[in-house]
């Protein structure tokens, strides 16, 4: 209730706060603090700056029955993606499968949550992925020192009785939010997560937010081309 209250008093519509607040709390309870209530101050600032638009419409920009492309007009990501998911689930009933895209969307929260909803509420198998089209470049290519891609997560879900099977991971060594959690806590990050602006390995989370900024390594360690390749294809 406190999360909902903070969002509502910060400019979110009551109906939106009632969706976004519990989603953030659930992420914390599931162990994903990077996508939990620590996001509330950032959301409130984005509302203030106009980077999140309360009560934005979800516009259909292309429709081919089993395919749907939408524009979120910078509404709350959790709200707009939830609307898209509900519509795609209805189309799956009609056509057997469906695919959808959403653009101009604010932070969507934990990607795996949508796969959980699709599996547990609709009985659907899902594959979901996110890119930022250069808006939040954090990840350097193997051998590079400048960021070129976002952390571009990938998630899959399969119905399994009361508890769906969910796979949810960033294509980088870590999600940006996990670095932020360490920074807020005043802790070091594990080795293998970050490079500083000179391309040297570092355990200091502050380097990712310095000027010039450091970068997050791609997923895969010595086989980092695999994580970067996945990220590149998601971006495309």
List where the protein language model places each region.
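N-terminal glycine-rich anion-binding loops that anchor highly charged ligand groups
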Residues: 12-36, 52-63
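Internal helical hairpin/lid segments
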Residues: 212-236
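Active-site cofactor/substrate anionic-group-binding motifs, chiefly glycine-
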Residues: 35-89
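Phosphate/diphosphate-binding glycine-rich loops and adjacent basic-rich segments that engage nucleotide
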Residues: 135-209
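Short, conserved micro-motifs enriched in small and acidic residues
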Residues: 14-15, 79-82, 224-231
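A generic, well-ordered mixed alpha/beta core segment in the N-terminal half of proteins
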Residues: 68-161
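Generic N-terminal amphipathic, Lys/Arg-enriched alpha-helix
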Residues: 1-10
């Amino acid at each position: 209730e406190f999360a909902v209250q903070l969002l509502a008093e910060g400019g979110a519509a009551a109906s939106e706060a009632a969706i976004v607040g519990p989603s953030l709390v659930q992420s914390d309870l599931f162990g994903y603090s990077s996508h939990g209530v620590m996001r509330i101050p950032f959301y409130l600032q984005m509302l203030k700056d106009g980077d999140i638009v309360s009560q934005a419409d979800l516009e259909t920009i292309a429709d081919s029955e089993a395919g749907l492309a939408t524009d979120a007009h910078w509404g709350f990501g959790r709200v707009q993606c939830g609307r898209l998911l509900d519509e795609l689930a209805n189309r799956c009933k009609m056509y057997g499968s469906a695919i959808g895209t959403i653009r101009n969307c604010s932070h969507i929260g934990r990607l795996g949550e949508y796969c959980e909803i699709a599996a547990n509420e609709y009985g659907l198998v899902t594959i979901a992925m996110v890119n930022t089209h250069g808006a939040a470049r954090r990840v350097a290519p193997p051998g590079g020192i400048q960021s070129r891609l976002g952390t571009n997560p990938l998630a899959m879900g399969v119905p399994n009785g009361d508890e769906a099977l969910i796979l949810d991971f960033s294509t980088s060594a870590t999600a940006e939010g996990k670095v932020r959690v360490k920074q807020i806590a005043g802790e070091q990050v594990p080795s293998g997560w970050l490079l500083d602006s000179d391309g040297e390995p570092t355990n200091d989370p502050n380097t990712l937010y310095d000027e010039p900024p450091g970068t997050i390594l791609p997923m895969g360690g010595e086989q980092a081309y695999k994580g970067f390749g996945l990220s590149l294809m998601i971006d495309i």
